[in-house]
Amino acid sequence: MASAGSLDVPERGHQRPFLIGVSGGTASGKSTVCEKIMELLGQNEVDHRQRKVVILSQDRFYKVLTPEQKTRALKGQYNFDHPDAFDNELMHRTLTQILEGQIVDVPMYDFITHSRLPETTTVYPADVLLFEGILAFYNQEIRDMFQLKLFVDTDSDVRLSRRVLRDMKRGRDLEQILTQYTTFVKPAFEEFSLPTKKYADVIIPRGVDNMVAINLIVQHIQDILNGDICKWQRGVLNGRSQKRTFPGQGESGGLILPGKRTHLESSSRPH
C-alpha cells in the first residue's frame, strides 16, 4: 500500500518501531488484549496521529475475492482461516514501511459483504506496533519482523461461543456459523494457527482476564517507551532472570527473555 505522503506529524527521530506480534485462535481475545494494553498505557485517548503505540490487525489484509469466491463466502463456504486467504505481500510491504517510519494507508475490510473497501486507515509513525491476527506467525518472513511474539491461548469452547455471538451480530444464522466453524475454522486452527504457538515468547491463557500477564507486558512496553528498548534483551530486570511466581489467583509466569518462552497460565484452569 502506498505511503500516505508528507503530513504534519510530530517527529519521532530515527529509532525503528518495536514490532509486537499477537496471535491466537479465532475469538481468543487478541484484539481485546491489544486494546487493554493501549488502555493501561493511556494511549487509547491520545490523538491517533500522536500515539506512541498503535494496533494493526491482520484482518485488514484479506485478499480481494473473485466473484465466485465471494458467492461461496456469502454462503459460509469460503475458508477465511487458511493462509492463502491473506495478502502476505501487501502485509509484509506495509510492515516494512511502518518499520521505516513511513506514514502508510492500510485497507479496510467489510466482514458482512466480504470485500475490501475503497476507504483506508492511515497509520502514523509510532514507537510500538501491536500486530494481531490468527496467522500472524505463520509466514516466516513476517514472523521474523516481530521483536516480541505473544500467543493468546483461550479454551476452544469459549472461542466458539464468542465466535457465534460475533457472527450473529454480523447477520449470519447459527447453522451457517457452526457449519463454517466445523468445516473451516476449527481444522484451520489446528493445522495452521496452533502449531505457531511454539514461536511465541509469551503465552497468555484466558486473554484479557489474565491481568498478571497483561501487566507484565505493559511494563515491558513502558520500558521501551521510556527509551530502555534493550532492557528485556539483556535478560536482567532488577536481577530477575528466571521464571517466578506472581501473587494472586494461583497464576504463575516468568520474565520475557530472548530465546526463552514464558508461559503465564493458571494452574487450576482445565484445558
From Swiss-Prot:
Coiled coil: none annotated. InterPro entries: P-loop_NTPase (IPR027417), PRK/URK (IPR006083), Uridine_kinase-like (IPR000764). It is an enzyme of class 2 (transferase). One of its GO terms (biological process) is CTP salvage. Pathway: Pyrimidine metabolism; CTP biosynthesis via salvage pathway; CTP from cytidine: step 1/3; Pyrimidine metabolism; UMP biosynthesis via salvage pathway; UMP from uridine: step 1/1. One of its GO terms (cellular component) is cytoplasm. Belongs to the uridine kinase family. This is Uridine-cytidine kinase 1-A. It comes from Xenopus laevis (African clawed frog).
